[in-house]
Amino acid sequence: MKNFIRAGAVVILMTGCQKIAEQQHPSSSSDSPTEVSATAVNRVNAVSTTVTTEATLKAAVANAKAGDIITISGTIKLTSTLQLLNSGTSSSKINISGGTLDCSGQPSGSWGVKVNGSWWNVQNIHITKAPDAGIVFQTGGNNYVNNITTDHCGDTGLQVYNGASNVSVNNCHSSENYDAANAGENADGFACKLSSGPGNKFSSCAANHNSDDGWDLYGNPNPVTITGCTSTNNGYGAAGDGNGFKLGSSGQNMHHTITNSSASNNIGWGFTRNGNAKGAVSYSNLTGSGNGKGLIDL
């Protein structure tokens, strides 16, 4: 992401303007996850909408175009999966932020939020009590995720898979996720596994007390980068593996990268290749203590 402005500095002019984003601070070329792209709102007649109900939220999402800003106010109870299917552009992203999505009223097996579109900024949202995964990036790419909290979901809190690529996940927290139907075998804090595309990254995220692993990269056919993340107290229920960071699977030679991260008090390994080729994972400055099987198996 380039040319950022802080979310609080965005001013939306609804018609007849050449530029609809005023910048309070100088632009930066850094990939800062805590700021909204200045170019995300440079479409003339971009719409800024604040929503308070499921109906208005889903209408705003269904009609979203490049540059639009959707703000969730308060708590919205969802009765079905929220689907982000439209796409922004590299210079004019779609933005959704704020509030809590209570997914407890959804049918069994439902994801809380599904993202199949591309070029979204998704930030500052609490997603809770989804019957299955909290938020899934299923397809699409170039989505930017910041300060998302997922908890008490019936599977993984935040998952990237099925070809989804260049998803940048920053400053997110995932905890207390548990799949009761499988005695905790599958509910990770974060997962980027099975079939995700290239270029996916996690930075400054935390996973705590999930029934399976903190991070799960099982079977991923593309390298993943993890930087500055923390994984603690994972693994409970009869079937949870409880690794802090599971970095591959048997038969793979996948060159994931993990740096400056910590794993403590997980019932399995702190950091494990999980059958990935020995030496395939690039790592540095990994710390932690109190893991049931040890700190590093890479």
Model-found features: residue ranges?
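Bacterial Sec-dependent N-terminal signal peptides
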Residues: 4-7, 15-44
